[in-house]
Curated annotation (Swiss-Prot):
Membrane topology field: Multi-pass membrane protein
One term under GO cellular component: membrane
UniProt record similarity statement: Belongs to the RTX prokaryotic toxin (TC 1.C.11) family.
Post-translational modification (record): Acylated by LktC. The toxin only becomes active when modified.
Comment field on protein domains: The transmembrane domains are believed to be involved in pore formation in target cells.
Protein encoded by which gene: lktA
Remarks, miscellaneous: The lktCABD operon has a complex mosaic structure that has been derived by extensive inter- and intraspecies horizontal DNA transfer and intragenic recombination events.
Protein name: Leukotoxin
Amino acid sequence: MGKLANISTNLKNSLQSGLHKTGQSLNQAGQSLKAGAKKLILYIPKDYEYDSGRGNGLQDLVKAAEDLGIEVQREERNGIATAQNSLSTIQNILGFSERGVVLSAPQLDKLLQKYKISKAPGSSENVAKNLGNAQTLLSGIQSILGSVMAGMDLDEILKNKGSELDLAKAGLELTNSLIENIANSVQTLDTFSEQISQLGTKLQNVKGLGTLGDKLKNFSGFSKAGLGLEVISGLLSGATAALVLADKNASTDRKVGAGFELANQVVGNITKAVSSYILAQRVAAGLSNTGPVSALIASTVALAISPLAFAGIADKFNNAKALESYAERFKKLGYEGDSLLAEYQRGTGTIDASVTAVNTALAAISGGVSAAAAGSLVGAPIALLVSGITGIISTILQYSKQAMFEHVANKIHDKIVDWEKKHNGKNYFENGYDSRYLADLQDNMRQLQNLNKELQAERVIRITQQQWDNNIGNLAGISRLGEKVMSGKAYADAFEEGKLIKADTFVQLDSATGVINTSKSDNVKTQHILFRTPLLTPGVENRERIQTGKYEYITKLNINRVDSWKITDGATNSTFDLTNVVQRIGIELDHADNVTKTKETKIIANLGDGNDDVFIGSGTTEVDGGNGLDRVHYSRGDYGALTIDATNESVQGSYTVKRFVETGKALHEVTATQSVLVGSREEKIEYRHSNNTQHAGYYTTDTLKSVEEIIGTSRNDIFKGSKFDDAFHGGDGVDNIDGNAGNDRLFGGKGFDIIDGGDGDDFIDGGQGDDILHGGKGNDILCTVKGGNDSISDSGGNDRLSFADSNLKDLTFEKVNHHLMITNVKKEKVTIQNWFREADYAKTVHNYQATADEKIEEIIGRQGERITSKQIDELIEKGKGKIDQSELERIAESSALLKESKFASNSLNKLVSSAGAFASSNDNRVGLGVPTSLYEHTQSVQFVRAA
């Protein structure tokens, strides 16, 4: 009973405003009422015998009629002849005889028999003994007749006939329709009698209208947990149409057609009765009933039927059809959630179609009545009456609609719970993500089979994050199981020789604890760990569903976060691209979803043995390269310029890398909310996902250990080397690179770079752009390529300058002031600063003593041809400031020179060739390629030392 009381209270609250408005209309109708039916006769025809065991107490009706002053007439005793112009008295509850309005006892008895089966308190077995209910029923009919037939003098009408009689007939038929529809909308006799009385009372007295909601509690459907399509057939008297609408195999057109059929069954009688009544009123009042008037009525009805109301319903059925088609694939993969969504769309589409069709028809009736009654004082009361009736029906429908929606949702909920029981408690929604992953694997298999070749790795480990799925979220909201859904799931698979292999024997991926372990190499020499989609931060999700309003719920997301990913590798030569690992968490966002406050997830990578490559992402990263030649790349993504200062490092390969990521967009994990509507119920479910989100800028610091090489960003990087051997690559941007002590390998890349080798035997490649190169002390090798004008200075040592892409004979050497200017065929210049300064001072300054060696001892062309600083000085002197091209051709053709420099040429060519191929702009994720080594480490060291 507690549940019934709650339903009653909810009904009362939801109907209050609608009923109040309806009551106002009905009250206005009541104000115009006069004494209606002069005589009401309870008519029992000849040969009719009612069975008290079969019926529901007709004897009580007879007694009640007598008490109410209603004449009871038996045809065989009184010989009353039924008028020939009767409205089928035997077929309807009410009709006309020559003496007045006839209340048909057989029809009443037949109507009451339907309640025989009810066992509820106040049902047929009890009501048959209750005279009060019979009196309530008959007095209600009297009241309705009084409203519909207000102002009519039945004696005169029956005597004179004509148009007034037609009006009376129409009013009587309307009353019949109202009674029948009320009868079809209830389940017990006491409810039926009370509803009849209620309508009649409200027509005459608006007091107590607010209690109508209490009467609705007697609808048996509301007291059941299972409210669904059966309520439509009971409440709206459309069993056949409801069966069609419930048929999942029925076409959309058939469903929509059934919806209209249902509407006709519900309101068809009222429509016909109202039309007849209004037209009769117009004729009786002497008003026009011609074509223009009919057109007015028709147009008003047409305007009331909006195709937009049905467009959304058609969309539901179309969505259901599309979902069912989509679901077929995932059914084969073990997941039927999309099919459940289609089932929900069909079920709620059925309800929407039915209710919308009925409401549309009711609106059309009201519109037609208002139009037809225009200009008729007689028609005004019935227009208000119909408005009130349709308002009540619409309000009941809307409340019933929510209950029916929930019934469909409950079925979905139960199917999910049953599935989990049958599968040992496995999470249904996790199974959904599993199916999505398998489908993705199938879709991309051809591309994945080429990964080993494209990435030049014996084994490719692919880590895929299945992120939030809207269909899965919708299903969780509909079924009220949002607490069990997850934001996604991460998977690992592997490929060798283009074939998919089982990965869990050598890959450990644990998103809950933040562990990625690829150390079990199984003698594989090279492997590439590819994060194909953004990997969410580690931790365990917990959800709690909270009610925030009458029909509003939110499933809050709480995450027990782990502060870092821990990556462990073994002896294999491995490549890790961490740029798709989400490290930034958007804690606070502004109204435009820009991140204003963040939290960071660190990456700790222990690479073990092997020559490893790591591409750094958006957040703090700690890399321990272990043994082997390891490289750290900052060339993918735009995560701030580097500032590296290793001048005080005491251990080789140790660096602290500071970055400031400027205002812009970066990969963040953010929390979002999906809203799911189940009729009036709104479910909001929080989930997390990755997004390239606008942020206000942030600082981050990386710690590198046992790292042999660092590749910079496309921004303006600063490198300050250690006292050990360093290898730096500036990439794009204006970079400032200082090798400091040690035998360093320094690459500028694109941009206008400033590179200083410092002490030690250094290799310096300015790359493209106008670069400033300084070899410093030691025996340095400087390299220049086309694409810029370089300025070179040197300060001691046995140094060499290589033109990686120019033949020696194609260069022009000339003296410009104190400098040596070398020009290639593209008119790009390399200026060696102060080449002639010491010699010029010696010529002009008495007893000048040379203090510096600022010459490059040897200049080498791309074929290994070379010219020494001594030869340059001699030929410049000979050519009066410029070397003749024939001299350069002679030097290039000197086989003795080429033979002498064979070892140097081969080693340098290999070094220069690999260095010239470097370009950070080509280092993109699309091709899935990894840049080739910029140098052969062992050979380059040997060459520098030998040179």
